[in-house]
Design a protein with these regions (language model features):
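A common structural microfeature
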Residues: 45-47, 56-58, 114, 143-145, ...
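Structured beta-strand/loop patches that form or line metal/cofactor-binding pockets in enzymes
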Residues: 6-69
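Metal-dependent enolase-superfamily TIM-barrel catalytic cores that perform enediolate-based chemistry
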Residues: 135-174
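Short glycine-/small-residue-rich flexible loop motifs, especially phosphate/cofactor-binding loops
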Residues: 47, 123, 163
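Metal- or metallocofactor-binding catalytic centers and their adjacent structured scaffolds
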Residues: 6, 51, 56-128
Length: 174
């Protein structure tokens, strides 16, 4: 069985964060997206950037602006990041991102806030190691087909028309 050789350092480089930045982003959708919760015209999210030694990694928080679908919101995530997780992270010197969940365990819940910061650290780690993020996470490569979510449509005919449009646009999963 062929096993890929990985370049290994003689000792892991300690990672100590020097900067954390959280940005609020609002991206307009190509068309309104309607669900039983209402109609969305843009997607709001938080983008977390972490830097160390001139390298930056980014993580996205997928919470919404309201708590109607998920318990965490952009505002609660911002609060937990600013007042708890970022101060914890600044006090750490870690050899690998796998150490973060244990460090964050004292903060109960708030998994989206933790995931956004942890993913940013994972990307920073991958960039420092000079490997794609999927490899740093243990992935094997290859392609993954993307899909599209259509949302509610006024009629079955309108729904079928949208499905046909998306399939024609190249989506294999609708």
């Amino acid at each position: 069985m062929h096993r890929p050789r990985l370049a290994r350092r003689s000792a892991p480089l300690a990672l100590k964060l020097q900067r954390v930045e959280v940005r609020h982003v609002a991206l307009p959708l190509r068309r309104p997206f309607e669900t039983s919760f209402g109609t969305t015209t843009h997607k709001e999210f938080l983008l977390v950037g972490v830097s160390a030694e001139g390298v930056t990694g980014y993580g996205e928080c997928v919470a919404d602006f309201d708590p109607y679908y998920l318990p965490e919101t952009n505002q609660t995530v911002l609060h937990i990041l600013r007042d708890f997780l970022v101060p914890l992270a600044f006090g750490l010197e870690i050899a690998h991102p796998r150490e973060l969940p244990a460090a964050f365990a004292r903060v109960r819940g708030h998994e989206m806030a933790k995931a956004a910061l942890e993913m940013a650290v994972w990307e920073l780690h991958a960039r420092r190691e000079g490997v794609p993020l999927y490899k740093a996470l243990g992935g094997r490569g290859g392609t993954i087909p993307t899909g599209v979510s259509i949302g509610l449509q006024p009629t079955t005919g309108a729904l079928m028309e949208r499905v046909e449009e998306e399939v024609a646009a190249g989506y294999r999963r609708v």
